Amino acid sequence: MHSHSHARGPRPQHPAATFEAGARTMTDAVNTRAPEAFFANAEDPLHAGFAAKAAIHSGPGGMPKLGEDARKALEALYDRPRTGKTLAYIHVPFCETRCLYCMFYQNPFREEAVSAYAKRLVEEIRMWSGRAAQNSAPVHAVYFGGGTPTAFSPEDLKLVLGAVKQHLPLANDCEITLEGRIHNFSDDKIEAALEGGVNRFSLGVQTFSSAVRQSMRRVDGRDAIISRLERLCGYDNAAVVIDLIYGFPNQTMEVWEDDLRTAASLSLDGVDCYQLNVFEKSPLARFIANGKLPNAADTALKADFFARSVEYFTLQNWHRLSNNHWGITARERNIYNALGKSACDCLAFGCGAGGRIGGHSFMMERGLKDWEDILSQGMKPAAFLAAPKPNWHLLRTISSDMESGAVNLSRIGRVFGVSSLEAMAEPLLAQWRDAGMLEKRGDWHVQTIAGQYWHVTLAQLLMNWLEPMLPGAMPAHPSASDIGSPDIMQRMSAGRKNNKAEAA
């Protein structure tokens, strides 16, 4: 991937906008369908490429069904055989503490409640075992997300992992990830996870700075984190990956560079770098508004953090797995995250879990009692299901390519029988090239550092640009869900674990 230079000196800070405010700004602009609303700022593409980020994750929207209608629709979908790659997501909706920046906190940790949940989760995994959608083809990656999956006791971990092995047709090389936090991730839990088949650990470190961690209500300090990570790596039995987040209040470039250096000094297999999203209703937004914390980093400063991480890991000879994911050993394959942005199916289990079958996105009930009550009636506890729009598969393929740092519209057009796809997009792509977001290399449109930083916005804008021109397109203006309606995007992000900023 191409590297543009980025500013080194301190730049003036502006109050960071919330995610929702940015999404509204982009939605209003794109709804006009004016070409300029899609164009990038050529004067400073890295720091000020667009007015705001379009969404947490790019993706075409759909028409939703709710409650019983969603459950009936999902029931019918489960008799269709799957094709292509498949994921499985398992949600564990309990946390010992609530981090200030998290919008996806569901339930406080109580040992008896977590143990009871594990047993109900096994019931749900077993419920549709043998149905075509669950068992007709291999599952290539399983992800335990949350919440805090490491809240499970060793016995609970063994129980649920045993059900996964028994009732899901795992591929021979299936990636099985357990997400969690360092705090209370004891040796007996690690060993139970390894015994149960976990071959990848994804731990939410976020920052090694004890001061920044304490301000975000994180529990363990720098030394404790490093000690536990080295202990986990010492088992040498699974990939160990950590998340780092940039943009926290009081997180200077010096703090961020120390985070990067510390991560690279450990025996890790991978590092994921995510930017902080400040949600309007999060405790963090409230603390900032009340003056209890300084502002989080604005878009321009976060761009410098991002560019520095790319520069640093490139110089350390780490390999790029996607715009946000880095690996240093062959163990880190990043399968779930890579396929999660694509059109592939994702089976989903657990309270608040989200998935996708045949292009239909769905989410389980987020209320624990509602989830339990519906499950006890012998039904899959779906709360929400969105049918795919026309051309959803093509659009998600664009989204997936953009996540990896480059898109080949000529190839995508051939695959989906839309020979003019690249020509449709060319006026927009040309402006982005001129603005410094993209470079053309053969048939590939490759993102610069600026393009990588804004890749989610680029993907969403490109899909919005193309959608009305595609065969069979619905004659409607883009809506808030096209750009990423905050409410729906937050619900689905919580369900599919793709906003790692909530990992503990």
What are these regions (language model features)?
Residues M1-T86, N135, S485-E502:
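Flexible, acidic/Gly-rich N-terminal and inter-domain linker regions that tether
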Residues R82-A118:
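Canonical Radical SAM [4Fe-4S] cluster-binding loop centered on the CxxxCxxC motif
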Residues K85, F109-R131, A137-V418:
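C-terminal scaffold of the Radical SAM
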Residues A88, I176, L347, H445, ...:
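A broad, low-specificity signal marking well-ordered, structured residues that form hydrophobic/aromatic
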Residues C95, D269, G442-W444:
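Beta-strand-connecting loop/turn residues
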Residues G354-A504:
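Charged, E/D/K/R/S-rich low-complexity terminal regions of large eukaryotic assembly subunits
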